[in-house]
UniProtKB/Swiss-Prot annotation:
Details of cofactor binding: Binds 2 [4Fe-4S] clusters per subunit.
Similarity comment text for this entry: Belongs to the complex I 23 kDa subunit family.
Gene Ontology biological-process entries: photosynthesis, light reaction
EC class (word): translocase
Record's subunit section: NDH is composed of at least 16 different subunits, 5 of which are encoded in the nucleus.
Catalyzed reactions per annotation: a plastoquinone + NADH + (n+1) H(+)(in) = a plastoquinol + NAD(+) + n H(+)(out); a plastoquinone + NADPH + (n+1) H(+)(in) = a plastoquinol + NADP(+) + n H(+)(out)
Bridged cysteine pairs (disulfide): none
Residues in 4Fe-4S ferredoxin-type domain copies: 55-84, 95-124
Signal peptide range: none
Membrane-spanning intervals of the chain: none
HAMAP family attached to this UniProt entry: NDH1_NuoI
The protein's name in its UniProt record: NAD(P)H-quinone oxidoreductase subunit I, chloroplastic
Length: 183
């Protein structure tokens, strides 16, 4: 008789403990229902990268002095710099510049250490191709702005915006060269 009563007490305690566990799980579920989703519907919605995002490298051919600092600081010696020495002006003249983004680790060292700031990181992150040789960008492909920035009608160049009046020392509200205008 006592064993039956002890068994019922034990059963009741286990049932209460199971109900607590279910209740705790339900509270966690309710807590997560109030949060915003962390994923996006990628092809239809695009992630807006942060200002310091390290995407595809943009190269300005006219600024480059062929010093090869970018090659020396690159952990994998990736940028290929072809230059020739012009004896008349006693300076190097850049002939070709290329980066293979199939190998690049996007560390940003080349951009950080470039003395003439001819390299910069863009916000472009869609570099997928069917052929890996298409990821080898020469100076012409590196010099192009991302297509999304060029063709987007909601983006306006800073040159088209009004400038600050004279005597005002505060910074401009648009801190970047390319600004997203929201209507």
């Amino acid at each position: 008789m006592f064993s039956i009563i002890n068994g019922l007490k034990n059963y009741n305690q286990q049932a209460i403990q199971a109900a607590r566990y279910i209740g705790q799980g339900f509270l966690v579920t309710l807590d997560h229902m109030n949060r915003l989703p962390t994923t996006i519907q990628y092809p239809y919605e695009k992630l807006i990268p942060s200002e310091r995002f390290r995407g595809r490298i943009h190269f300005e051919f006219d600024k480059c002095i062929a010093c090869e600092v970018c090659v020396r600081v690159c952990p994998i010696n990736l940028p290929v710099v072809d230059w020739e020495l012009k004896k008349t002006i006693k300076k190097k003249q850049l002939k070709n510049y290329s980066i293979d983004f199939g190998v690049c680790i996007f560390c940003g060292n080349c951009v950080e250490y470039c003395p003439t700031n001819c390299l910069s990181m863009t916000e472009e992150y869609e570099l997928s191709t069917y052929n890996r040789h298409e990821l080898n960008y020469d100076q012409i492909a590196l010099g192009r702005l991302p297509i999304s920035i060029i063709e987007d009608s909601t983006i306006e160049n800073i040159f088209n915006l009004t400038s600050l009046p004279k005597g005002k020392i505060e910074g401009h509200i648009y801190s970047r060269n390319i600004t997203n205008i929201v209507n």
